[in-house]
Amino acid sequence: MPKLEQFEIKKYWQIFSGLKPIENKVNHDQVLPILYNSKLDSSVLNKIWFLADIDDDDNLDFEEFVICMRLIFDMVNKNISSVPDELPDWLIPGSKVNLIKERKKRKQIENADLPPKKEIKVDWYMSPDDLNQYEKIYNSCAKLTDGTITFNELSTKLSTKFFNISKTDLNKVWSLINPQNLPSIDRDPTFYFIHCLRQRNDLGAEIPASLPNSLAEVCNKKQLSYDLRSSQPPTKRKEEANEVDNLRDNGQNSSSDNSGSNVLSNENSIKQKYASLTDDQVANMREQLEGLLNYKKSEKTQGGSKLSKRINIRSITDDLDNIEQQVEVLENYLNNKRHELQALQAEIN
């Protein structure tokens, strides 16, 4: 690390004067633009600020400002690979030597009094206050058309709030709560992303290697894709319809067979399927079966000719439903492409 030159000190004085110091000191907010323009990790910048603020008053006089700027430039220009734990002697101003010695003594005493450091684990429980705070951060983020948030958007937002986390921390937690490596995540994983990083920032909690099973299910939840080229399997609506159709088939078979054993067998089969369904599926199934009952009643009263007409109408209705679903997918796909086109045009302009 080369020593300070006179031209450097003049350059730092020009920058210092431009910040409009009060009583020959600048505070953290005044220096903040310079810190962020360096593109260094917040953990690195915090360590530089701590080393430079020798008198621990949360302000920098000119001598301390010179230390701060020199360490930043050395890191940016790769003159040093990491911030030193202590200032080199040639960078300590003569007026600050005694303060440095006092700081070292305090640190030795504090370290001697500290109990052995225990590993802090992430607590995944979120209190109502936590949820309110995370909701505000979530609402302040720019979202994609499907309501999800990208890594860059979240990391930029959190870097202005959590100063003790590094880019490595951000990447680790993103991989943890995004095991499918999706380009963006929705609301629930976003909350867990913020919650984990907050404990890392405030408590120094260790980032876990895996999620609890209950959280893994939330973070592994698949997002609905509107890309027509996607190989995503059919939606849940179709799966539920298939289950109801299977139950309807069982009902039709039982009505065509008068034997008590077949009826009992079909009844047990229906009960087993019924027990495995969710509330939404049960409601959907009930609606379908009531429709089937009404259909059977009308079949007996109106005869075979009207039956064939109703079957044809049902077939046409199903076709219309399928076409309607395809139109919705195409409209969403068109809207996404329009947004992409607008973004490209904005970049060109």
Curated annotation (Swiss-Prot):
One of its GO terms (molecular function) is actin binding. Keywords: Actin-binding, Calcium, Cell membrane, Coiled coil, Cytoplasm, Cytoskeleton, Endocytosis, Endosome, Membrane, Metal-binding, Phosphoprotein, Repeat. Ca(2+) binds at D53, D55, D57, N59, E64. GO terms for cellular component: actin cortical patch; endosome membrane; plasma membrane. InterPro entries: EF-hand-dom_pair, EF_Hand_1_Ca_BS, EF_hand_dom, EH_dom, End3. Sequence repeats lie at residues 276-295, 315-334. Residues 40-75, 146-164 form the EF-hand domain. The keyword Phosphoprotein applies. Residues 276-334 are annotated as: 2 X 20 AA approximate repeats. Residues 249-265 have a biased composition (Low complexity). One of its GO terms (biological process) is actin filament organization. Residues 226-265 are annotated as: Disordered. Residues 8-98, 130-222 form the EH domain. Its main location: membrane. This is Actin cytoskeleton-regulatory complex protein END3. It comes from Saccharomyces cerevisiae (strain YJM789) (Baker's yeast). The lineage of its organism: Eukaryota, Fungi, Dikarya, Ascomycota, Saccharomycotina. The gene is END3.
